[in-house]
Each structure stands twice: as C-alpha cells, then as structure tokens.
From Swiss-Prot:
Belongs to the periviscerokinin family. It comes from Derocalymma versicolor (Cockroach). The keyword Kinase does not apply. This is Periviscerokinin-3. Pfam families: Periviscerokin. It is found in: Secreted. Mediates visceral muscle contractile activity (myotropic activity). Keywords: Amidation, Neuropeptide, Secreted. The modification Threonine amide is found at residue 11. GO terms for cellular component: extracellular region. It comes from the Eukaryota. The lineage of its organism: Eukaryota, Metazoa, Ecdysozoa, Arthropoda, Hexapoda. Expressed in abdominal perisympathetic organs and abdominal ganglia. GO terms for biological process: neuropeptide signaling pathway. Coiled coil: none annotated.
Length: 11
C-alpha cells in the first residue's frame, strides 16, 4: 500500500 502512487501490495 503506497501513498501518492498506484497502490501496490506491500509485503
């Protein structure tokens, strides 16, 4: 979950 960008699944 990134902020400001496209939400990527953070592990």
């Amino acid at each position: 979950g990134s902020s400001g960008m496209i939400s990527f699944p953070r592990t």
